A protein has these predicted regions:
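Structured, amphipathic secondary-structure segments that form assembly/contact surfaces
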Residues: 1-12, 22-33, 40-59, 80-190
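Solvent-exposed, amphipathic alpha-helical segments
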Residues: 64-75
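Hydrophobic and amphipathic membrane-targeting/association helices
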Residues: 16-18
Length: 190
């Protein structure tokens, strides 16, 4: 009976040691998320562990800024698409950028022109103007009742700030954390 007791206490000590080891290992947090960048064909271009200090590249920022301009300056024929574009644009602005969008929307209400007018935006270039701003050039084609009414060339300087998303909602809406903080656009003449 004495041997059985020694074996039971030995198993109890072994079990306690293994439980302590599992607890220690679970607190280490060894799961590392990986980021896989793919091209338009679905082939892996870059594979690396995710970093909380990731800084987006200029082409990545340019893509999001081009989409921002298309969302704000374009005028589709569908009110739902227009609303979704504006809400998506607000996801890419700081408070100052949102105030600039509000001023633009108040003076040029896009919902008032909905119906007979559509505006197609074609981005021609997005280049870095300084460490905190990008210059975007685009062409707007305005259609009235389905007929081309005007073609205008526009440029903008967008000042940006890059902030790492801190919660799941911001990560889903703006994964790179690129925010427009100032907007200055104008029509080109000539």
């Amino acid at each position: 009976a004495r041997n059985w007791r020694l074996m039971a206490f030995g198993c109890l000590l072994l079990s306690g040691g293994l439980a302590a080891g599992l607890l220690w290992q679970s607190t280490k947090g060894t799961v590392t998320p990986w980021v896989v960048e793919i091209d338009h064909l679905g082939q892996a271009q870059a594979v690396a562990p995710a970093s909380p200090f990731y800084q987006p590249t200029d082409p990545q920022i340019a893509f999001h800024l081009a989409r921002f301009i298309e969302d704000v300056r374009g005028l589709p024929s569908d009110a739902i698409v227009l609303r979704q574009g504006w809400l998506r644009a607000y996801d890419f602005t700081t408070d100052r950028g949102a105030a600039a969008l509000n001023d633009y929307a108040r003076s040029n209400n896009p919902f008032a022109r909905l119906g007979n007018t559509q505006v197609a935006v074609e981005i021609s270039s997005v280049i870095r103007a300084s460490s905190e701003s990008f210059r975007i050039a685009w062409t707007e084609r305005r259609y009235d009742s389905g007929q081309l009414a005007a073609t205008e060339r526009w440029t903008a300087i967008l000042s940006i700030v890059v902030e790492t998303p801190r919660d799941a909602d911001r990560l889903r809406k703006n994964p790179l954390g690129v925010y427009v903080k100032a907007i200055n656009w104008s029509k080109e003449f000539g």
